[in-house]
């Protein structure tokens, strides 16, 4: 999960609306804009942003530490998971679901992906959640 910023703040407002009917899971993956001198996985260059506070983890333990720090910002009934970072199994969730820095997925209880956002849009996702719950 990228460092939380103003673009990512809205999901946490949405969780309070649907907390009793939808489970919210955050997955901590690669840092899109790690703190220098680390490079972005998207550009291959240093690409810091104002919210770049973490280095790119090189071990699973470092990634878990970053996730704990970020998880402290997650409130309510939400789950924070950490993508794998081991030789031969690096970033399976990030690689499988899309290497986007701010994506979101609405997944039905049967495991079917209902809605995909390659760049999270709170209003659109909220609409998709309401539609899914109305079925």
Identify the residue ranges that each predicted region occupies.
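Structural microenvironment flanking redox-active thiols in thiol-disulfide oxidoreductases
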Residues: 1-74, 87-90
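Thiol/disulfide oxidoreductase modules built on the thioredoxin-like
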Residues: 74-77, 82-128
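Short, hydrophobic alpha-helical segments
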Residues: 133-134
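Short, surface-exposed linear patches
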Residues: 10-11, 46-50, 102-106, 128-130
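Amphipathic, non-transmembrane alpha-helical secondary structure
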Residues: 2-5, 126, 130
């Amino acid at each position: 999960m990228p460092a939380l910023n103003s673009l990512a703040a809205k999901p946490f407002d949405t969780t309070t609306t649907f907390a009793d009917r939808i489970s919210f899971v955050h997955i901590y993956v690669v840092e899109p804009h790690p703190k220098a001198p680390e490079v972005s996985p998207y550009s291959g260059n240093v690409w810091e942003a104002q919210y770049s506070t973490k280095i790119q983890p090189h071990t699973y333990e470092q990634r878990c530490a970053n996730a704990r720090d970020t998880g402290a910002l997650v409130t309510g009934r939400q789950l924070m998971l950490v993508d794998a970072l081991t030789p031969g199994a690096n970033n399976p969730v990030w690689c499988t679901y899309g290497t986007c820095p701010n994506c979101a997925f609405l997944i039905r209880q049967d495991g079917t992906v209902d809605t995909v956002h390659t760049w999270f849009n709170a209003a659109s996702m909220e609409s998709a959640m309401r539609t899914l719950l109305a079925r």
